[in-house]
């Protein structure tokens, strides 16, 4: 039996605008406020190619600093009780924007990608089997719509745009304890509540990769068990990046011991990771051009 592992390069090779640079353009067009906040607080890179990993490096200190103009002194001459909440409101607004609102815009963008446009691609993938199994990191239905692969043959590990409202985005934000460094009775209540807002929204929205992967592996135990007869794995459009390493290691444990791994490459392409790092034997791995699959 054959297993295909599908990454975003698969959709891009079909001419679909599924890269983070395309999401950047979408946000710039549809939500300028969110766009500006991402540019200011998330080190996503010029084309937002680092967006997922950068969600673990949100500059929360800058969020707090930029909101300090709303932190009125209790000794100000025109003090009003309304000032009790202005600072927390501003921090809360930014954290909501960079968590729930970002995820909502991301889901809307994915759902708006027209898979039918893939028919216009000049670079076609060699025929793939409908009887094979598919482990997809993509949110789209390219396999179903273009190749007529049945839903039951595919696992969308980060969610499917047709069925899931809560697509998985972001793998790195870990809050093992509060970000607040000065918890205590002497701390300004407004500042403490602002830290609570950051802890809650980012911690709940962007789970660390280890937790996500462990949860998914447990939830999809039936799928991983079904891989016991797989003797060939073909990787299409995935960089083999370390962030997904646990998936590859789990797949390798689930398939036949001497299964053959075939990694498809564009001409001149280099992968950012290596299957050997995920316990795949070097002797079982072949790197081939797409047209030679």
Give, region by region, the residue ranges found by the protein language model.
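Short secondary-structure boundary/capping segments
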Residues: 17-24, 150-152, 250-251
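A Trp-anchored, charged/polar loop motif used as the substrate-binding/catalytic surface
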Residues: 114-123, 208-225
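SIR2/sirtuin-family catalytic core signature
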Residues: 2-14, 219-293
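Hydrophobic packing residues within well-ordered alpha-helices of enzyme cores
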Residues: 23, 51, 143, 251, ...
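Short, conserved aromatic-histidine micro-motifs
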Residues: 25-42, 261-269
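Extended, H/D-rich, highly charged conserved domains that either
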Residues: 36-201
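Conserved beta-strand -> loop -> alpha-helix junction used to position metal-binding or nucleic-acid-contacting
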Residues: 6, 25-26, 159-160, 291-292
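An N-terminal structural lobe/cap that precedes and organizes the functional/catalytic core
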Residues: 1-36
């Amino acid at each position: 039996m054959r297993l295909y592992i599908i990454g975003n390069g698969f959709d891009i090779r079909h001419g679909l605008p599924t890269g983070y640079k395309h999401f950047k353009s979408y946000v710039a067009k549809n939500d300028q406020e969110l766009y500006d906040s991402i540019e200011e607080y998330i080190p996503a890179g010029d084309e937002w190619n680092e967006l997922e990993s950068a969600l673990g490096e949100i500059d929360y200190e800058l969020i707090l600093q930029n909101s300090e103009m709303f932190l009125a002194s209790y000794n100000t001459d025109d003090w009003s009780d309304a000032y009790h909440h202005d600072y927390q409101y501003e921090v809360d607004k930014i954290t909501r924007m960079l968590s729930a609102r970002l995820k909502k815009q991301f889901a809307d963008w994915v759902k708006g990608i027209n898979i039918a446009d893939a028919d216009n691609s000049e670079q076609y993938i060699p025929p793939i089997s409908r009887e094979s199994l598919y482990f997809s990191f993509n949110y789209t239905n390219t396999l179903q719509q273009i190749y007529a692969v049945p839903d039951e043959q595919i696992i969308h590990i980060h969610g499917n745009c047709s069925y899931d409202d809560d697509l998985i985005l972001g793998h790195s934000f870990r809050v093992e304890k509060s970000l607040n460094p000065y918890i205590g009775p002497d701390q300004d209540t407004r500042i403490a509540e602002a830290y609570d807002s950051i802890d809650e929204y980012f911690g709940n929205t962007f789970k660390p990769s280890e937790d996500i992967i462990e949860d998914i592996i447990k939830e999809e135990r039936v799928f991983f068990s079904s891989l016991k007869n797989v003797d060939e794995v073909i990787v299409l459009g995935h960089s083999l990046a370390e962030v997904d390493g646990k998936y590859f290691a789990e797949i390798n444990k689930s398939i036949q011991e001497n299964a053959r791994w075939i990694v498809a490459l564009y001409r001149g392409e280099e992968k950012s990771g290596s299957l050997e790092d995920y316990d795949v034997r070097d002797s079982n791995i072949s790197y081939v051009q797409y047209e030679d699959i």
